[in-house]
Amino acid sequence: MATRREARERALALCYELEAKGETADEVLAELPAPPDAYTATLVRGVGDHRVELDRWLGKYSERWAVERMPAVDRALLRIGTYELGWQPELPVGVVIDEAVELAQQYSTQDSGRFVHALLARIADQVRA
């Protein structure tokens, strides 16, 4: 059984793939050699099912950044984090943001951690208010 951290990391790779291939969440998940853990599948399906709304939130709360111009890894992480904030109310805001920042620092650009933190904090202020 994967930890939530591992599930988020796996979901990041799959959400990146989802966009790169232009496939649905179910198509990406079906291509895996073994079924993912439940939380990974929840995140990937959540991002796939709510992508338009997630991108609307990201566009609304990002200052001077069009969603399509964000680095692809950041975009995938932000969609996952925004999904968790909006559809997983039992998760503490700090955990969602911290996990996304750690993954951004590990897999994206030098400035991504700060960007991901600031944007998810703005979204959390609205979604969890």
Predicted feature residues:
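N-terminal interaction/assembly modules
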Residues: 1-129
